[in-house]
Amino acid sequence: MSRTIFCTFLQREAEGQDFQLYPGELGKRIYNEISKEAWAQWQHKQTMLINEKKLNMMNAEHRKLLEQEMVNFLFEGKEVHIEGYTPEDKK
């Protein structure tokens, strides 16, 4: 049975995560406040960001950058800037 949460990102009730996807306090916050739909949107942005900036997840600085972008996107409403990318709705 799925659980319903109020998603901070979507600003509406939505299906919550099945389990904590990220470690620590930030992971608890994501589990409690971010829906599956919002997390999928972040994963799409994350993949683009890793590829375009050629981030290496073995590098602690790159992981820190990605975590900050995640917080900005999910909790602060900031768009992820990916150089050279124009969203479909803005073309």
From Swiss-Prot:
Instruction: List, alphabetically, the InterPro entries matched.
Output: Fe_traffick_prot_YggX, Fe_traffick_prot_YggX_sf
Signal sequence annotation: none
One GO term describing the cellular component: cytosol
GO terms assigned for molecular function: iron ion binding
SUPFAM superfamilies recorded for this chain?
YggX-like
The induction field says: By oxidative stress and SoxS.
Q: Which domain of life is it from?
A: Bacteria
Kindly state a single biological-process term from the GO annotations of this entry: cellular response to oxidative stress
- Keyword terms of this UniProt record: Iron, Stress response
Briefly, what is this protein's role? Could be a mediator in iron transactions between iron acquisition and iron-requiring processes, such as synthesis and/or repair of Fe-S clusters in biosynthetic enzymes. Necessary to maintain high levels of aconitase under oxidative stress.
Matching PANTHER family, A to Z?
FE(2+)-TRAFFICKING PROTEIN-RELATED (PTHR36965:SF1)
Output the NCBIfam families linked to this UniProt entry. PRK05408.1
The UniProt similarity line reads: Belongs to the Fe(2+)-trafficking protein family.
The UniProt subunit note reads as follows: Monomer.
* Protein name listed in UniProt: Probable Fe(2+)-trafficking protein
Which organism was this protein described from? Escherichia coli (strain K12)
| Gene for this chain | yggX
